[in-house]
């Protein structure tokens, strides 16, 4: 069978290894496996959400309310925006896909940081768009400005991942707003706030308020997700917030019922459980200090993280791939950043006992 020729050259996103695969490959008992590779919530899912899912499970034969009225209402109350300014996606990456189908093409490219979330580039290539990247791995707005100034007519979408995955750094909000002021109103600026709950908990200077963003800039799209801080990675629920014109355009690309009945109920309930969110954030930054101290004691380079992970960058004397492979055989799943052309490992911040075991075993490898 023949397929469209461009399909052969499309990159595939490298996700963290699932626990099930490690069990099959190495015969390790599930209870002995620690997965800190995919930035999932180590506290799991809110008990209130689990109870809600159980109660709604009997309705699994029914399609969800495709207006997502109650979820949009909850997000509207949280961010003080109108429901008409919100779109729901099967993970925020689906809305990234919508945005690129709406704005990018073979003549209109995208601008991203040197090292950032891979799906921007992958979805851009789906529509044949050219990728413009900064030389700096971290977000460098001076480079963004220069590349945009030089290629303004050829760039239709700019992605700012704040905080940035997989490095963890985060720009101050005032820097971001200052940058967007210089961007044409016909260029879509996407603020990917998948980890924003963590960033604003650590520093108010990093918080990008969606209401202020879309009131100030008609060309801005804010993305959020329930996969990280809210502990619903397996439910696949994300959202976008923008002015009504952008939301209407994205809705034209959305298939009906793009999240499930159970996912919808889980997200609605998750928004109500502030205690679980608070516990998640407190555990994260308490345990983050353990990793930072380990890195300092062992002369490992790391970038200050405003997320739920930390990235260790190794010098030429260490091999991140070898370290990850050796730990994997012992049931420790971490994220090798080889696919980003980095000799580095990204580690999700787990619970105390998980972190201690991981660092004890990592110590033996370095």
UniProtKB/Swiss-Prot annotation:
PANTHER family: HISTIDINOL-PHOSPHATE AMINOTRANSFERASE, HISTIDINOL-PHOSPHATE AMINOTRANSFERASE 2. It is an enzyme of class 2 (transferase). Belongs to the class-II pyridoxal-phosphate-dependent aminotransferase family. Histidinol-phosphate aminotransferase subfamily. One of its GO terms (molecular function) is histidinol-phosphate transaminase activity. Pathway: Amino-acid biosynthesis; L-histidine biosynthesis; L-histidine from 5-phospho-alpha-D-ribose 1-diphosphate: step 7/9. InterPro entries: Aminotrans_II_pyridoxalP_BS, Aminotransferase_I/II_large, HisP_aminotrans, HistidinolP_aminotransfase, PyrdxlP-dep_Trfase, PyrdxlP-dep_Trfase_major, PyrdxlP-dep_Trfase_small. Homodimer. Keywords: Amino-acid biosynthesis, Aminotransferase, Histidine biosynthesis, Pyridoxal phosphate, Transferase. It catalyses: L-histidinol phosphate + 2-oxoglutarate = 3-(imidazol-4-yl)-2-oxopropyl phosphate + L-glutamate. This is Histidinol-phosphate aminotransferase. GO terms for biological process: L-histidine biosynthetic process. The keyword Transferase applies. Its EC number is 2.6.1.9. The modification N6-(pyridoxal phosphate)lysine is found at residue 228. It holds the Pfam family Aminotran_1_2. Its cofactor is pyridoxal 5'-phosphate. The keyword Transferase applies. The gene is hisC.
């Amino acid at each position: 069978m023949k397929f469209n020729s461009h399909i052969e050259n499309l990159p595939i996103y490298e996700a963290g290894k699932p626990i099930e695969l490690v069990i099959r490959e190495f015969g390790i008992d599930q209870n002995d496996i620690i997965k800190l590779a995919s930035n999932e919530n180590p506290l799991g899912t809110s008990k209130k959400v689990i109870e809600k899912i159980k109660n709604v499970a009997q309705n699994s034969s029914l399609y969800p309310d495709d207006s997502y009225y109650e979820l949009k209402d909850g997000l509207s109350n949280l961010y003080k925006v109108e429901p008409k300014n919100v779109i729901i996606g099967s993970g925020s990456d689906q809305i990234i896909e919508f945005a690129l189908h709406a704005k990018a093409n073979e003549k209109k490219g995208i601008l991203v940081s040197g090292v950032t979330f891979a799906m921007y580039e992958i979805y851009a290539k789906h529509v044949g768009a050219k990728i413009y990247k900064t030389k700096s791995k971290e977000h460098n707005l001076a480079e963004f400005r220069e590349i945009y100034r030089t290629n303004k007519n050829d760039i239709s979408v700019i992605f700012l991942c704040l905080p940035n995955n997989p490095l963890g750094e985060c720009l101050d909000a005032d820097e971001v707003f200052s940058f967007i002021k210089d961007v044409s109103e016909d260029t879509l600026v996407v603020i990917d706030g998948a980890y924003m709950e963590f960033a604003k908990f650590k520093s108010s200077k990093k918080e990008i308020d969606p209401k202020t963003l879309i009131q100030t800039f008609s060309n801005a799209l804010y993305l959020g997700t329930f996969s990280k801080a809210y502990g619903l990675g397996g439910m696949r629920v994300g959202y976008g917030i923008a002015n009504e014109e952008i939301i209407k355009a994205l809705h034209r690309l959305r298939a009906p019922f793009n999240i499930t009945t159970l996912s919808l109920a889980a997200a609605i309930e998750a928004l109500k459980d502030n205690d679980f969110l608070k516990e998640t954030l407190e555990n994260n930054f308490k345990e983050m200090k353990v990793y930072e101290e380990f890195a300092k004691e062992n002369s490992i380079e790391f970038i200050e993280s405003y997320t739920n992970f930390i990235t260790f960058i190794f010098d030429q004397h260490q091999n991140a791939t070898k370290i990850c492979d050796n730990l994997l055989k012992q049931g420790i799943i971490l994220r090798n950043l080889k696919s980003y052309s980095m000799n580095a490992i990204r580690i999700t911040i787990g619970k105390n006992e998980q972190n201690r075991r991981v660092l004890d075993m990592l110590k033996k490898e370095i």
